Each structure stands twice: as structure tokens, then as C-alpha cells.
Curated annotation (Swiss-Prot):
UniProt keyword Heme, yes or no: no
Superkingdom to which the source organism belongs: Archaea
EC number: 2.7.7.7, 3.1.11.1
Family according to the record: Belongs to the archaeal DNA polymerase II family.
GO MF terms held by the record: DNA binding; DNA-directed DNA polymerase activity; single-stranded DNA 3'-5' DNA exonuclease activity
Chain's role: Possesses two activities: a DNA synthesis (polymerase) and an exonucleolytic activity that degrades single-stranded DNA in the 3'- to 5'-direction. Has a template-primer preference which is characteristic of a replicative DNA polymerase.
Pfam family, one: PolC_DP2_N
GO BP, one annotated term: DNA catabolic process
Transmembrane segments: none
Protein name: DNA polymerase II large subunit
Swiss-Prot/TrEMBL keywords: DNA replication, DNA-binding, DNA-directed DNA polymerase, Exonuclease, Hydrolase, Multifunctional enzyme, Nuclease, Nucleotidyltransferase, Transferase
Reactions catalysed, as given in the entry: DNA(n) + a 2'-deoxyribonucleoside 5'-triphosphate = DNA(n+1) + diphosphate; Exonucleolytic cleavage in the 3'- to 5'-direction to yield nucleoside 5'-phosphates
Length: 1240
């Protein structure tokens, strides 16, 4: 343990040292040139408190939060104390602030701490926290003099002073509050109310207003669900009304949709449009998370939230329905609701032939990722590949799918009638390539970690019977049989559930309570000791390699000791009826007289063939004969009760009921077969999981649309390609005016929109465009830092942008390029452009900049805790340099075949990303050398050279980057991350995608001044960097990931009883148990290789929708667990018909655009020409786009439209839509701009 601690400390020190070294390089570089600021604009943070300070630009929070956490022992409680201290002015986060600003900062800081200061919700999700006047909703501010001890509240509408007793608090939410998650969004409202109470403001009362505010909330939710979309939880109207009437603060919001309310309009302080952020807080926050809120309300003694009890009680009826006897779990078809054309359905809910649930976590699964056999990826024609997202029936909603070879593969029927189990992925690939698979009888097992059930609060369900369960169960069954044979029934009942290791002790305790002490003592204790000795000396040695046990050994073990049959050779008896078993016994013919050397033949009868296929018995056809060969022949005969020596079937063992009951074998056929065999036959696959394809895997460079090389405005002067070089060479006839930062070089006396003049090196001066005075001397109420300048040089040096001179200057320093794509205009507030030198160097490397000045690559997230060196291009020497000195068995690393445990911030890049990153490193070296005049730092020439370098990982909707270390390259189209760094970004692995950047790129090129000046502009930007991750300060979802090497027998027994997931928490080791030292993690299943399987989904390789749809239906025809007619119906209902309706509706309401300058028009000019540049004005939605799914829909109706009444209804709907299209466009489905307006 000391070694593990030392290694982890050394790893963290290295991350900190290298990060600091890169900060020094970036600081030195930026001080030399024209970057927006002379130092890196990303703050390196080591704790939540520091991240809060960097995110919200406040101070004194980090130290105080650390003190309170140490004092209170609870971060959430410390958060409420921070809120209180900020409002009271005891904690000064921005000097002396008036009351309304203290409240605003307090709520934002509180939310930032609750979200680990990773997401941008505290900045972007809360538009404002306002004090408002009761009855009017007018905003009220504190105009008292510093230090603001006695607030003076003044209405901003009329300027009158307002009594605090006549005020209330409102939180104005925006769309990005979604990034906080439901719990944090709900807690933000609770924090705001706590702030209100500390500030001494009255509670919000909707009855104070002349308008029906409660009805407004209800109408908004109903309208949103009807016209916009759905929430994770869709509350009833009664629930919304209950919240709206009783919430102590006003939940307000910015308009996020164009859709307006119809009934409750024109309320003075509210917009008519839907307020998506406010609705999300109510629905997914307060309503959905009411039970969690109640705990906080009680814990912190916050008054006014008693209505939450009624919210929770409304769900009690549903809970009562779930109190039935827990013997099964109902199929759940929610995952099928939005089936997309071209993305196949793999299994209907809980359908026979669907995925068989198996408990376990491989080194590349867990944290919402599941494992399937790589053969499955091939037999689905490559639709499902490494990193593809699946929408699943349970335990969660979605999962990333990854290859695991230590689970059972799919079983298929070939065109020659053979049934084959595809243990070898290479065989599966070959069969698919030759098109020899006729039907996929079974999809194989899906490996799901028990932690997923805990995290999703899903009841445990019976898993597939597997070797790791069997090997723990065998000794227990030997114990039970021994006790039953040798002890009275009352003693047996008392001892049967006692674990083997405590059996002798418990027997001794029981014996001490008997009247006949000698006889009783000799009985139970003697029996217990003999059983323990038998298990220790004879049984356990035979279980050393359960995966490699032969069928002869398995039969001998079960017949000798009466233990359940080995799961590898157990067939799916629960998928057939007892009468089917009798048919098999009557129809078979046996050749051979000893186990392991048998052959079973059946006449090629359709019913017998069906039964064998249902059982998943591998077999082949020889003329008119069905042949089952070893090892399956012996396995089948043993389970049917056949004795090869006598050539007869055994008599039924009617005395097995006690053992079958003890083992909770409920299925009628399994009980019947068990009695025939003379030993228990478990349900092989009691739980099936339905699934469909979700998002494809992804590994792709992030590009803006259209993609620029540099953030430099060129308007239309660069043509459609925005090519600055084209303008520079005089090849473009267009000119334009663009908005840029109004900075003047005092030395050159002209407009230079940079911090430092690139011509003379003088620091420029910011001017105000309203008064033409330096910003420092400006008296304007709202200074305007932007000037509209001519691209061409004019007579006024203050209003012309010297583009050609800037290009010439850049070419002198870094060379030239044929093409240099800029942007039409800057979207930031100051509109300060990037230096052109950076763009030229990017263009030379074929790299494209993102909105914040960085270069990014997007990948689907996949988890990885351990890696085999050769999988990722690591040599033993390189591995030792990275700190991997010993493998998982404690042996020194000397071979590429050894498996090592990753460190918490390690990542494995896909090759495509690594090749891109090589170009980025070369660009950064060029930048340092040619532009900044410094020595290069990377020296990277090939992907493997990236190993050991640091990157910055960033999730969408967040504002905190996390430093990661590259430890390998894999041939995949997703990336593997240690789950801890994934959780540090508040992301799991259910199909989410994140981005990475090179660390030096972020430090050199990122600037807040480039970010868009609009709501959400600060999202998806690395405002703060975490160099070293603290496992206590990450998304706690990952804490439930199991990190044990196996599961105890008790867990499987709990699963058979459908126990609550919480009962599993104490049975397995989870990451939460190792937060102090997250090393020594284990996994239950290994895989041959983390890159074994196809890597590019067929969905992406097929270009036409017709091809994708045909392939989807063809796969549906082949998979036994799927009904192709249902697939076609769902595709029409959830994809084609809504799209056709929406597109036809949008066509009539569309806007128009100029083909040349891209100007937008609600109503096009009568001339059809753009008044700005003379370009042609075009439609934005064309008839072909509006009707693109009409023909595929018609073909589906033609094929399936007469199946039932529901299909006939769909057929009528398609017919009506076709008539509507003809009315709009005519029979040729084409229309020009003139025709759109009815002109000839």
C-alpha cells in the first residue's frame, strides 16, 4: 500500500510540474506578442474552491470552503454556510457589494460548489438572481453606500424606494441550467430560498399578482410537452400547480423557444415565449428530485418546503403497485420510442434471443459502459462497433458498447441449417463476409456491472448462470446436500443458510442448546466438519479452472455431488416447454457409450429443429439428419437423464424439490429437466435485455461550420470561402466593412485591433466608438469598444483595417499559404481578432480553429482501468518510464503481454486522433519558433511520440478542462479514459462524447475575448484547468463503479429475489471505498484486446438513407428477437412521419438567404437580389429536403401496410402527406423562388 501511495504521489507531482512548466512557456511567449492578454487566460486550479474562483472571477472562496469542510466534514453543509456568509457580507468575494449583488453571487457560488465548478451552469444557467417588488415583478436594487450595512432598496422601473417587506426573490434561469443536472438545478432553487431567508426577504406569493401565474406555469409545461419535446420527468398538471403555488421564490427564466403561450399572455414581467430553463428546474429538478430535496430541507431546517411531501406522496400509488411478489420484472419498451431509420433495433424488450444479462465489470466496461462479445459486432453487419452507443432496456437508459471475450458469444443459424456458437470473432467475420448467416438466434451475453444497478436504483435481477457464480455455488450446494442427508429437518433448516466458513462454529452453538448433549454434539458438529473437509480436500481442487472444465468433468462433478450443472454446457431450458423435452427424449438416437465420445442424431423434423434452436444446442445437418457432436452431445444427454453405459434414461429424482427451492429455480421446465438429470439445471438466461443502436461511435476533429484557420474577420471580401489570401492577392472583387476592436496604436496612429501593434511593438490604446475617447477617459454610460472598419484601406486610418499589411507582416515572419480561411465576422464582445500568423501556420498543417482559439478533437468516451501494453503501443521500457513498474500481479513489467493498472488521469487516444495531434504538436513547435521566437517543446514526428504528453480534456456544456496524460494509441474510433478523469468532467460512458486539446495549445491560444457574446457563449470553454484530480471532488456517479475481482454468492442469491439495489452496496467493493487511494482496482472479466472488433459502423459507411433503411430491415429479419414489421412501424412513427410533417410546415415559414454574403431575410427582396451585395436570394429549405423521407415511407407502407389496422392508419397518413406535398410543390416536388410566391 505504501508503494501504491508513493507511485500515485509521484504521478500527481509529475502532472503538476509539467503543467506548471507549460504555463511558464506560455507566459513567456504571450508577453512577447499580440495575444489578447500577456499571460495564459486559463487558471490552473487544485481544488473545487479554486475552480469556483476561476469560473466566477471571485476571491476568498477557496480558503474559506476548505476551512468549513474541515470544520463541518460535509461539503454541501459548507456550501450553505458560504451562501450565508456571502449574503451577510462576512465573506467578501468581490469587495463590498450591495445586497442584490451579494445574493446573486451567493447563489452562483453555491451552485458552482455543488457542481464541482465544472459545468458552466453557475455562469450561463442563471441569467440573474433578482430582488423584485411584490405585485409588479419590477426589479429592485440596493443603492446604499458602501459598506452596504443597511440596504436601500429602489425600484429600477420608477426609482421609488421599496420596503423590504414588499419584496421577494426571483431566479431567472437560462437554458444552460440543464448542464447542472436535475439534483443541482433543484438545489439551486433551495439555495436561493435559503439566501432569501438569510437576507430577510418575504417569500414569493403568486396571488399577489393580478395575473394567474400558477396557470401560466401549467400552460407552459403542457405547451412545451406538446410542441417542443419532453423532459426526463414529465410531471402532471397537478404536480406543476402544487409547485407553482407553494415555491418560496419565483422560478423565472429567459425565453428559450419561439413557441408562445396562448392563454396566459402579456404578463408585464414575463415573456410570452416558453422559458425552457425555468421549466427544466421545475420538472427535472423540483418535481423529479423531491425526495432528495426533502432530505436537505430537513437537514438544514429550511422552512416553506413542506409541499414537497405531497409531491412525493403522489408517487406512492405507483410504489404500491410494485409491492407484488417479486418473481419477475416487467419488460420496458421506453428505449424503442425514438427508433431512427438506419440504426437497427437489436432486440424487443426482454425478448427470447435478446441480450442475456451477465453481471461483471471488464477492464474496459463499467461507469455506464457494457460489454458484448466482439463476434456480435460482426454478425450485426458492423452496425454495432467498438464505442457505439446502445439505448437499453435496463438498468439505465443508454450505454457505450465495448468488446469482452470472456463472455458467451452470439449463436447463429447458417444457410445450410447448422447452428453455430461464434466463440471466435474471426470466424464470425468470415461468415458475415460470405453471407452465410441466415438467422441470429441469440445475441449472446451483455456484461453489466452491478454498480450500474446501484447507480440507477434498479432492483437486482437474476443474471445469466456463469462460471464465476457456479464456482462459488458448488461448495454451498455440497454443504446443503450433506446437511440434508445427515441431519434432522429442523437442524437442517437452521444450518442450510450458514456460510461454509462458519458452519462448524454455528453447529457447535446449536449443539450447546440441545437436551441430549452428547448425541446432539456428535451429530451436527461431526456432519459440519465432514462437509467442510470434503469441500476443502475434494471439491475445491476440482474447481480451479472452471472456464476450461471439460464436459466429462462437469457431468462427473454434478452426478457425484449433486451440484448444479456447469453453466458452459447448460442449455436454455426455460425457453422451451416440458413437452418439448419429452419430444427430444423420444426422438434422439445415440452413438457411443461413454461421456465425451458421444454423437446424437435426430430425424430432420421441423419441430425438433426448432426445439434445438430454442435451446441453443450447436448442431449441423447431414442429409436428412440433425447431428449433435461433442461436447454438446454429452451435455444434452446428461441433462436429459441419459446413461451411456446402460443406454437408458434414468428415473426422475423426485427428491430434488428441496434443493431446487433452496436454489430458487422457479422455471417449470428447468425443474423438470433437473429431476430427469438427477442434479439441478439452472435457468441459463433468466433476464434478457432489449437494445437498439443509438449514436454512432465518433473520433473526429472539431470544426466550426464553415471551418476557419484563423479568427479574423474578412466579411464577404474573401468570397464564399472567406479566403483572406484571395483578398490579399486581389482576386476578390468584393469589399466589406467588419466590426473589430477599436484600438489605436499611438506610435503608428492608426487602427490596430490587437493589444500590441504588430508593426512597431507598441501597446495599443482601447477607444470608445461613441465618444472617440480612450476608454480610460470615457464618460459614456455604456462604452462601445467596437468600430466598423473598411477592409480596404481608406483615408481615415481610424476606420480602415490594414488587412493586406497585416498579411504581408505575417508572411515575413512565418511564410505564406495558398489559402487562409477567416470568419465573416467576430461574435465576441470586444471583437479582437487572432494574429494572422497563427492562421497561416494552422493552414500549413491543415488545422482548423475553434471559437475560443484552440484546436479540438471529439471522441466518444469509453472507460479503461487496466491495459495490456501491446494493445496501445507501449513497450516495457516506455511503460516503466510512465510509472508502470509492476503489473496487476505485482511482477516487474518486462513483457508487452502484461496488464498494468492505469493512473487516474490516463487516456488512450484513437489513432486518427493521434495523427491529428501530431500535426497540432508540429504547429505549436512552429508557432513557438517562428512567431514567439522560442525553442520548440514537442519534437513529435509520429503518433507513438505523443505517449507521455499532457492534454486537456473538456466536456460539452462545461467550463473546466481536466489535464490528462496520453499513455497509448489504439486502432479504434473512440477513446479510452480512466473513469476518474471521465467523472472529473461530470461525464459517464453511456455514449457521451468529449473533446481534447493539447495543453500548450490551450495555454497559448485560448482567450475569453474570443468567446461569443451571447447566452451559452462561455460553455464548452476551458475557463479553468484542473491539473490534479481529487477523487472526492468528482461526479459521484463513478463512486458506484465496482472495483472488486469477483462477486460473493450472496449477491447472486439477492438477485434471484429481485432485491433492492441498495442491498448490494455492502456486498461489493466500489470506487467509493477507495477514494483515499484509488489504486489496486480489480475487474471480474478480462478481454483478449480492447480493440478487437470492427471500428467504423456500417451506419456511417452507407451514404443513402434508402440503403441504411434496407440494411436495418434486413438485420431485423435475421434477428430472432426482432419483429421487422414493428421496426418499420416505429421508424415511421418516430422518425419519418414527424420529419415530413415538420419539414412541410417549415417550408411555408422559411427564411431566405443570399448565396453570396449569406444575409438572411424573413421576406425576400422582390427583385430576388440581395440589396447588400447583389447576390441571388435562395430558399433555405428545398422541396427535396422537405420530402426526402416521403418515398422511403411509401415503400415501407407498400411492404407492410396491410398487416393490421394500425398499419392501415399509417398508410392513410402517408397518403395525406403525399397529397399535401403535391399541393405545395406539384408532382415534380420542385419549386423556385418565383414559384414560391406564386409568380409565373
Amino acid at each position: 500500500m505504501n508503494r501504491a501511495r508513493e507511485e500515485l504521489d509521484r504521478y500527481r507531482e509529475t502532472l503538476e510540474e509539467v503543467s506548471s512548466r507549460f504555463v511558464d512557456v506560455a507566459t513567456k511567449a504571450r508577453q512577447r506578442r499580440e495575444d489578447p492578454k500577456p499571460e495564459p487566460e486559463v487558471m490552473l486550479a487544485t481544488s473545487i474552491g479554486e475552480r469556483v474562483e476561476g469560473l466566477l472571477q471571485v476571491e476568498n472562496v477557496a480558503d474559506r470552503l476548505e476551512e468549513l469542510e474541515e470544520e463541518l466534514g460535509d461539503r454541501e453543509e459548507a456550501t450553505f454556510r458560504i451562501v450565508e456568509e456571502v449574503i451577510k457580507g462576512e465573506l467578501k468575494v468581490k469587495g463590498d457589494l450591495p445586497l442584490h449583488k451579494r445574493i446573486d453571487y451567493a447563489v452562483r457560488i453555491g451552485l458552482a460548489v455543488l457542481t464541482e465548478a465544472v459545468v458552466s451552469a453557475p455562469l450561463e444557467g442563471i441569467a440573474a438572481v433578482e430582488i423584485r417588488e411584490r405585485g409588479t415583478g419590477h426589479r429592485v436594487v440596493d443603492e446604499s453606500e458602501p459598506p452596504h450595512e443597511e440596504p436601500k432598496l429602489v425600484c429600477t422601473e420608477c426609482g421609488k424606494e421599496v420596503d423590504p417587506e414588499n419584496c421577494y426573490l426571483a431566479v431567472k434561469y437560462a437554458g444552460p441550467i440543464r448542464a447542472a443536472g436535475g439534483t443541482a438545478a433543484a438545489l439551486s432553487a433551495l439555495l436561493a430560498d435559503y439566501a432569501r431567508q438569510v437576507a430577510g426577504l418575504p417569500r414569493f406569493n403568486p396571488d399577489d399578482f393580478d395575473h394567474d401565474l400558477v396557470g401560466r406555469y401549467v400552460e407552459e409545461v403542457v405547451t412545451y410537452l406538446d410542441k417542443v419535446g419532453s423532459f426526463q420527468y414529465n410531471p402532471s398538471e397537478e404536480e406543476v400547480e402544487l409547485v407553482a403555488k407553494n415555491i418560496p421564490i419565483e422560478i423565472d427564466g429567459e425565453p428559450t423557444e419561439e413557441v408562445e403561450v396562448q392563454g396566459h399572455r402579456d404578463i408585464p414581467h414575463l415573456p410570452n415565449q416558453l422559458r425552457g430553463g425555468a421549466l427544466l428546474v421545475i420538472c427535472e429538478g423540483i418535481c423529479q428530485k423531491a425526495p432528495k430535496l426533502i432530505k436537505r430541507v430537513e437537514k438544514y431546517g429550511i422552512d416553506g418546503w413542506e409541499f414537497l411531501e405531497k409531491l412525493v406522496n403522489k408517487g406512492s400509488d405507483d410504489e404500491e403497485e410494485g409491492e407484488e411478489e417479486k418473481t419477475k420484472i416487467k419488460p420496458n419498451d421506453k428505449y424503442m420510442g425514438e427508433l431512427v431509420a438506419g440504426r437497427p433495433l437489436l432486440s424487443h424488450p426482454s425478448a427470447k434471443g435478446g441480450f442475456r444479462l451477465r453481471y461483471g465489470r471488464a477492464r474496459n466496461t463499467g461507469f455506464a459502459a457494457v460489454g458484448v462479445h466482439p463476434s456480435l459486432m460482426y454478425v450485426t453487419k458492423g452496425f454495432i462497433v467498438i464505442g457505439t452507443q446502445l439505448k437499453v432496456e435496463r438498468p439505465g437508459k443508454a450505454a457505450c458498447v465495448l468488446p469482452v471475450t470472456e463472455i458467451e458469444p452470439p449463436v447463429v443459424k447458417l444457410r445450410d441449417g447448422s447452428v453455430v456458437r461464434l466463440d471466435d470473432p474471426r470466424e464470425a467475420k468470415e461468415l458475415v463476409e460470405k453471407d452465410e448467416i441466415e438467422e441470429i438466434l441469440d445475441l449472446g451475453e451483455m456484461l453489466v456491472a452491478v454498480g450500474e444497478f446501484i447507480e440507477n436504483n434498479h432492483p437486482l435481477v437474476p443474471p445469466a448462470y456463469c462460471p464465476e457464480w457456479w464456482v462459488k455455488e458448488v461448495p454451498d450446494v455440497v454443504k446443503v446436500i450433506g446437511l440434508r442427508k445427515n441431519l434432522p429437518n429442523d437442524v437442517f433448516e437452521k444450518l442450510k443458510d450458514v456460510p461454509l466458513k462458519r458452519l462448524v462454529k454455528e453447529a457447535s452453538r446449536l449443539s450447546g442448546n440441545g437436551n441430549n448433549l452428547d448425541g446432539f454434539l456428535n451429530g451436527p458438529v461431526k456432519v459440519a466438519r465432514s462437509i467442510v473437509e470434503l469441500v476443502r480436500k475434494e471439491v475445491i481442487p476440482r474447481l480451479s479452472s472452471p472456464e476450461r472444465m471439460s464436459v466429462e468433468e462437469a457431468i462427473e462433478l454434478s452426478r457425484e455431488y449433486g451440484v448444479p450443472f456447469h453453466p458452459k454446457y447448460t442449455f436454455l431450458w426455460h425457453d422451451v416447454k416440458p413437452k418439448d423435452v419429452d419430444e427430444l427424449r423420444e426422438a434422439l438416437e445415440v452413438a457411443g457409450s461413454e461421456w465425451g465420445n458421444l454423437r446424437v442424431e435426430f430425424e430432420n423434423d421441423g419441430e425438433i429443429k426448432r426445439i434445438l434452436e430454442d435451446l441453443l444446442v450447436p448442431h449441423r445437418l447431414e442429409d436428412d439428419t440433425i447431428v449433435v457432436e461433442e461436447p454438446w452431445a454429452s451435455a444434452l444427454l446428461a441433462q436429459l437423464g441419459y446413461d451411456p453405459e446402460s443406454g437408458e434414461f434414468r428415473e426422475q429424482d423426485e427428491d430434488l424439490d428441496y434443493l431446487l427451492d433452496y436454489l430458487v429455480i422457479r422455471d417449470e421446465t428447468c425443474r423438470y429437466v433437473s429431476k430427469l438429470a438427477g442434479f439441478p439445471i439452472r435457468e441459463k438466461a433468466p433476464t434478457r435485455i432489449g437494445a437498439r443502436m443509438g449514436r454512432p461511435e465518433k473520433a473526429r476533429e472539431r470544426k466550426m461550420s464553415p471551418p476557419p484557420h484563423v479568427l479574423f474577420p474578412i466579411g464577404i471580401a474573401g468570397g464564399n470561402q472567406r479566403d483572406i489570401m484571395k483578398f490579399h492577392r486581389g482576386e476578390s472583387e468584393d469589399t466589406d466593412r467588419v466590426e473589430v476592436c477599436y484600438r489605436i496604436c499611438p506610435e503608428c496612429d492608426r487602427l490596430v485591433p490587437y493589444r500590441v501593434c504588430p508593426f512597431c511593438g507598441t501597446e495599443t490604446v482601447q477607444y470608445c466608438n461613441r465618444c472617440d475617447e480612450p476608454a480610460d477617459e470615457c464618460d459614456c454610460e455604456e462604452p462601445d469598444p467596437v468600430v466598423r472598419a473598411d477592409i480596404e484601406r481608406n483615408d481615415d486610418p481610424y476606420s480602415s483595417l490594414p488587412v493586406r499589411e497585416l498579411v504581408r507582416r505575417a508572411e515575413e515572419e512565418v511564410g505564406t499559404t495558398d489559402t487562409l480561411k477567416g470568419v465573416k465576422g467576430m461574435t465576441s464582445r470586444l471583437k479582437m481578432p487572432e494574429p494572422l500568423q497563427k492562421g497561416i501556420l494552422r493552414a500549413k498543417r491543415d488545422l482548423f480553429v475553434f471559437k475560443d482559439g484552440t484546436l479540438r478533437f471529439d471522441c466518444n468516451d469509453c472507460p479503461l482501468t487496466h491495459v495490456r501494453l501491446k494493445e496501445v503501443g507501449l513497450t516495457p521500457f516506455k511503460a516503466r518510464l510512465l510509472g508502470f513498474e509492476r503489473d496487476i500481479n505485482g511482477d516487474p513489467v518486462v513483457s508487452e503481454d502484461q496488464v498494468v493498472e492505469l493512473y487516474p488521469q490516463d487516456v488512450v487516444l484513437p489513432r486518427k486522433a493521434a495523427e491529428w495531434a501530431v500535426r497540432v504538436c508540429q504547429y505549436l513547435d512552429d508557432l513557438l519558433r517562428k512567431y514567439y521566437g522560442l525553442e520548440p517543446v514537442y519534437g513529435v514526428e509520429k503518433p507513438e511520440d505523443l505517449i507521455g504528453h499532457l492534454i486537456v480534456t473538456l466536456a460539452p456544456h462545461t467550463s473546466c478542462g481536466v489535464v490528462g496524460r496520453v499513455v497509448g494509441i489504439a486502432d479504434i474510433n473512440c477513446w479510452y479514459n480512466h473513469p476518474i478523469i471521465n467523472a472529473a468532467r461530470r461525464r459517464n460512458c453511456d455514449g457521451d462524447e468529449d473533446a481534447f486539446m493539447l495543453l500548450l495549445d490551450v495555454l497559448l491560444n485560448f482567450s475569453r475575448l474570443y468567446l461569443p457574446d451571447k447566452r451559452g457563449g462561455l460553455m464548452d470553454a476551458p475557463l479553468v484547468l484542473t491539473a490534479v484530480v481529487d477523487p472526492y471532488e468528482i461526479d459521484d456517479e463513478v463512486w458506484n463503479m465496482d472495483v472488486c475481482g469477483d462477486y460473493p454468492l450472496e449477491l447472486y442469491r439477492k438477485a434471484l429475489e429481485y432485491a433492492d439495489a441498495g442491498e448490494a452496496e455492502e456486498l461489493i467493493e466500489r470506487l467509493e471505498d477507495r477514494l483515499d487511494l484509488p489504486r489496486g482496482l480489480q475487474f471480474t472479466h478480462d478481454t483478449e484486446a480492447i480493440d478487437l472488433g470492427p471500428t467504423v459502423t456500417r451506419y456511417s459507411r452507407l451514404e443513402k438513407m434508402e440503403e441504411k433503411l434496407e440494411e436495418q430491415l434486413d438485420l431485423a429479419r435475421r434477428i430472432r428477437a426482432v419483429d421487422e414489421s414493428d421496426v418499420a412501424k416505429i421508424v415511421l412513427d418516430s422518425h419519418f412521419l414527424p420529419d415530413i410533417k415538420g419539414n412541410l410546415r417549415k417550408f411555408g415559414r422559411q427564411k431566405f438567404r443570399c448565396s453570396r454574403c449569406n444575409a438572411k431575410f424573413n421576406v425576400p427582396p422582390l427583385s430576388g437580389k440581395c440589396p447588400r451585395c447583389g447576390g441571388d436570394v435562395l430558399l433555405t429549405i428545398y422541396p427535396a429536403t422537405a420530402t426526402k423521407y416521403l418515398e422511403p415511407a411509401k415503400r415501407l407502407v407498400e411492404e407492410f401496410g396491410t398487416h393490421d389496422e394500425e398499419w392501415r392508419t399509417i398508410a392513410s397518413e402517408v397518403e395525406l402527406l403525399e397529397e399535401e406535398a403535391k399541393t405545395l410543390f406539384g408532382s415534380d416536388h420542385s419549386v423556385s423562388l418565383k414559384k414560391f410566391f406564386g409568380e409565373t
